[in-house]
Amino acid sequence: MEKMRFPESEELPEGVKEIEVKDTFGYCTELYPDVEYAEHSGKKLHLQIMTPLVYGQDLKWPLIVYVQGSSWHKQKLFQSLPTLVRMCERGYAVAIVEHRESELAPFPAQVIDTKAAIRFLRMNGAHYGIDASKVALWGDSSGAHTALMAGITGDAEYLPEKYPQTTTEVDCIIDWFGPTDLVAASQYPSAIDHDSADSPSGVLIGGKALHDYPEDAYPAHPVVHLRRNRKTPPILIMHGGSDPLVPFNQSCILYEALKRMDKEVEFVKFKNAGHGWGGFMSETALDIVEKFITVDR
């Protein structure tokens, strides 16, 4: 978009400080809060939709669907807002997905909800200035697990009932330090419990200890849903080397599985970074994400 230029004023009253600043262009942001997209047993689920704001032009923006991590519990939906607003400034629409918490609805409810949100946005996105033909699915931590599950399974399984004629498939997935093998997570050093019935993973599979019920955890592993003969969206993995909550090995498991099946994947390790800190909020991190999203495939 070209910016409108006006003549420079020659006025400079005494005492006024005049400086030159580097011209960096970014869009303002418009928020559509609490857009209802689904309801389950009386619980309404919402999207927080943000789009770049341009007056006087009917523009459509490529879409980022974001799943906020929460250990699959009730989400703090605006936790990643500073990062996501900066993506709006770069020219993307962003929709933050509220999903059912695992205490109320175990796996695969979160995956089904995310796919319902994608379908809703494809059907109704034009109202919000969204180009729903270009969809990137992004999540952090447990949200990345949900994004991986939704993106990898696509239209094959875990489908919502509404808008059955509308695809849930996405163009790419951004996985920020997501769990990929729930059972294996307990085999590596971590600051939290990954195995007991009341651990985040245990609650996700219905309040069961993973070592007692590995067969119930198995379907919640993104890697087991990879198929050589089924299209997998390109995946960008980003993980901190010193993550205290989701072991770095979790991303290695996914990366190696994708490479074995000749799937498109990029893996970036943030040296000495933790669980979402140590560089993930930097412009460098967002540059990596944007470059991956905009690749002409």
Residue spans for each PLM region:
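Alpha/beta-hydrolase superfamily serine-hydrolase fold, recognizing
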Residues: 1-297
